[in-house]
Amino acid sequence: QTYENIEILVCDDCSSDKSLEIIKSIAYSDSRVKVYSSRKNQGPYNIRNELIKKAHGNFITFQDADDLSHPERIQRQVEVLRNNKAVICMANWIRVASNGKIQFFYDDKATRMSVVSSMIKKDIFATVGGYRQSLIGADTEFYETVIMRYGRESIVRLLQPLILGLWGDSGLTRNKGTEALPDGYISQSRREYSDIAARQRVLGKSIVSDKDVRGLLSRYGLFKDVSGIIE
């Protein structure tokens, strides 16, 4: 990244390949990189919640293992948040298949807003809370919660595609039952999670409780217990 004043927190979620070994070798030669491991597989959003607690910077953003960021992504987003009252800066993304071909959406467009690209002012987590203990979709729920709390003007969207996302056969967006389809449509489990989370935001937790949401996630096998992380 062209913006070099960054802290990189990486967590290995009990991978079965040599990911942890590779990450540790990088951290050995780059003091900005700190490496953690899950005690037990716990999914991306529990890990994010844990790493947010460890982070020292004023801005938080994320990078999934199968994504590639434009070299100027961090710099552009930092500049927006430093010079704007917004609390989140997002960018577009392009999905690329393993053969290098771009995956278009149902409207024949190649780009879409990328929720994973969100750069968030750290103090927002103290107000809104962290991500739900879900295997999928918790970043979208967080995004919608911020809009309801702070208004749409609190989020700035950069139209440039600053992330390439691998559209391969692995990953939660491709697994049967949790998939986001190539044309932009999503699985039944994702739709139901989105619906119940929206009802909770509108009606309040006295009507739609966290237990209700957890029950739906559990029925689909999407609820994940927190196992913690270790260095």
Label each PLM-derived region with a short phrase:
Residues 1-230:
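Nucleotide-sugar donor-binding/catalytic module of glycosyltransferases
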